[in-house]
Amino acid sequence: MKLSRFLLGLAAGATALTGIAAQTPVSGGVLKFAVSAEPPNYDCHAQTSFAFIHPVRPHYNTLLKFDTAKYPAIKGDLAESWNVAKDGLTYTFKLRKGVKFHDGSTFSSQDIKATYDRLRAPPAGVRSVRQASYADVASIETPDPLTVVFKLKKQNASMLTNFASPWDCVYSAAKLKQDPKFPERNIMGTGPFTFVQHVAGSQWTGRKFEGYFEKGKPYLNGYVAIFISGAPMVNALAAGEVLAEFRGHSPADRDRLVKTLGDKAVVQETPWVCSLVVTFNTRKKPFDDQRVRKALSLAIDRWAGAQALQKIALVRHVGGLLRPGYDLAASAKELAQYPGWSKNINASRAEAKKLLADAGQSNLSFTFTNRNVAMPYVPVGVFLIDQWRQIGVNVKHEQLETRLYLAAQQRDNPTFDAALDFNCDFMDEPNLQLQKYLSHDRSAINYAQQTDRVLDDLFDKQSGELDKKKRYAILREFEKRALDQAYPVPTIWWHRLIVHHKSMKGWHITPSHYVGQDLADVWLDR
């Protein structure tokens, strides 16, 4: 029987999957799955890509995690229970007893403190992409080995969900004391699988951790993440050489796999907390001129692009800074008022040409840096270049493999002109999605390099606002300024399509390709 899953009510966490009877998990077997890119290093705290989280996440635990069957509900991971004070300023966690690291050492509250100290105030030379998420933490206390207390400077609307971030791998305090950069080159966590090997350009292997704290888990004896992409990856899925690819497929690949696999295929799909954004290097002329950036955003027909691209790529939805359909996102009526979101593309492009002329850039040409990942970077990149051509702009398309692509944007003094960046998160939350638009000195994922204290102040206001209506109003102020200044600008939001073999059980799709990848609950029905 062919199975389908549609998670359309994200805010309500709709997770109904009809026609599937409950089954008892069976232990054993090795799961082989595909990953279409390779991690640049091994440090969770510095990474943002699926290429890292899919092979590496099974080695680690986090303080809390999402219950994928009830997403976006949260449950304990290393935390057994927790309490939030009435004033919202103190978070107390009781930790699991008897948890071991893979080297046999005992886990304690000191490891949580060391991990979050590294996240919120990284030592020199250590990169913490999510430092801004923990800027409101004033102190971390460890009254005993199984209790950790976070004290906040002010209320934060997203703090509890921050603690469920799949990126906040818990590291050994002892290892971090010896070398703060230990996680960049070494894998050593408390997760369901121990590290076996990473063969560059080939595969990543994990083995069942016999000392895992959850009795009976993981069910798998191990896993192999095979680095393969494009047509070879789809062929491997069709042939059963791999059972899954956890990021997402194009509609065409989905249709081909369903046709080939027949009743062996399971299809799961959902809107995606992920978008591609065009980032302009504001330290480089002419992209230091707001008129040029705004003109290039105005030239993009997002509405027509979404209709055309959804047939060939894993993008579908038109939205602003927040995922369309999310209750804090702009309405369609509000969107249409923003520059670049009008449905009158002829008027928008006329304005774009005038802005370029006023800036002395009527004959603008530049290099557009992109990632050589077919879905959806290449088709969206080609689409954007065609859009800019229609206002007389000449663009060279530079496509780089993941490591070089990330390095081109993340270096201290980037030399790129403009780049197709991604803004993906583990859940709908402005405190996460808006970090890319903060000033460069406040956000490690701002590659546009701008400083904008107006946006910084608006971010802080919405972050601490617990009244949803008031927060919504502040978010519209933020969005209006961000899209008018056009440091980075969103293009089209993604739609996640997963096809996997029905023999793989226990995996639930969520609106984030970062969530649910520890593989502790996955089992094989052979």
Q: What is each PLM-predicted segment?
A:
Residues D67-A69, A164-P218, G222, A231-P232, ...:
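Gly/Pro-rich hinge or "lid" segments in bacterial periplasmic/extracellular proteins
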